[in-house]
């Protein structure tokens, strides 16, 4: 072999090394894949299948992060899609746009020059056949083993047994599930998986969830180290304790960002350029409206939240300390407007939003507290706050050994602590809950026992017995066909039951009330019919 041939081979090797090491914004074709290079200082290069839209390779700073046995994709993969790629010269930046089209779904993946982020949006005209809409990044667990912000509660790698279904496991004596990674929509910032000597973070950020379902307090799976792969999700809708119909249209934009300089924050995200890219269903701020106003009647110690929704979109905002609020930019339309006392619904009205206009619409709590209270257990906040195991159930199964005893428990008014009252009553575990209280004299009039709940499973509702008198059985609540508390969920329809206690049923001295989970259904232990408490109050 001649000297010149060796020289040319060496030159070619160096050239290939340099081209791989230095970022070159753009896209190329390699076999059945489009290869997109973000041209970022920390190089991000990923490959998208021309036939399925699967992301089948993600190289960040020269390290492969994509799980090889399954791609990153919408749902469980689109199967077949028409996939195209183009470069767009925007007003301030250049972009690469990948577009994947099926008969009912269009997936967009967008890269902005010099930005190690994959911006995405999903447009649908029908719910996917699998019954949920999600993006899942399947990443290498040996490269990205850790999860943020809740850590190992959703790491199911190394499980020794299954507790429930195929999604709650035991790892080192602790119950773990992907469901325990969830965060309320209103609290979402970034959720990440991370690892490596240079501490690479891969994070999902959702600037808004206007086309998702469930409202501000809905929560769903965010991440899961499942062993072979570490999975990072953006759940846009699902059947996981879902309380409203799925919304069609554009979901997003949302983004998967790659960082070696810490955890990116939502407040730093700029998507003002998104309207330049020809994304179907995208509504720019100029075609949106705003609602301003003041929420009143929220007591001190509770958070005020205003929520707007219709069949096309949903929005929310926390109120200022004085109750003032300004909505996000909203699509035009007529909305139901709800005021929450933390998560407890206290007012409902309607408002119409017009493009390019600001609408003033204040809202006041209609929750009536003008009565004489004999006792109250908990607060009307739409959560099981303070009750036994309420501090644990979001991140572990009710059967976990770290849980306090579920009972059956007896709560004595005036001497028991709030932790002596269970957050939930299960038909086959801690039925009934007993309340004991003393009255100096018997009320001469009828009283009301109000039981505020947050979520019912398998038709459970409260059956009340007062000093041996059985109250009429309430009607079954609206069915939510999903496991709840065992998956760390507590937010349902929030049924409130007012039990009319006739005069003469309460006595001077010691009184006893029992509250049982009533249901025609059955189930074993923590999958037996159950409901979650918000507050219990006796008043006249």
Swiss-Prot record:
State where the protein is found.
Secreted
Q: Which domain of life is it from?
A: Eukaryota
Question: What is one Pfam family matched by this protein?
Answer: fn3_3
CDD domains found in the cross-reference section: RGL4_C (cd10317), RGL4_M (cd10316), RGL4_N (cd10320)
Identify the keywords attached in UniProt to this record, alphabetized.
Answer: Carbohydrate metabolism, Cell wall biogenesis/degradation, Disulfide bond, Glycoprotein, Lyase, Polysaccharide degradation, Secreted, Signal
Molecular function GO labels: carbohydrate binding; carbon-oxygen lyase activity, acting on polysaccharides; rhamnogalacturonan endolyase activity
Question: Where is carbohydrate linked to this protein?
Answer: 89, 368
Give EC number(s), comma-separated.
Answer: 4.2.2.23
Disulfide bond sites: 53-100, 192-203
**Annotated GO biological process:** cell wall organization; pectin catabolic process
Q: Which family does it belong to?
A: Belongs to the polysaccharide lyase 4 family.
**Function field:** Could be a pectinolytic enzyme that hydrolyzes the alpha-L-rhamnopyranosyl-(1,4)-alpha-D-galacturonopyranosyl glycosidic linkage by beta-elimination, thereby generating oligosaccharides terminating at the non-reducing end with a hex-4-enopyranosyluronic acid residue.
> What protein am I looking at?
Putative rhamnogalacturonase
User: What organism is recorded for this protein?
Assistant: Neurospora crassa (strain ATCC 24698 / 74-OR23-1A / CBS 708.71 / DSM 1257 / FGSC 987)
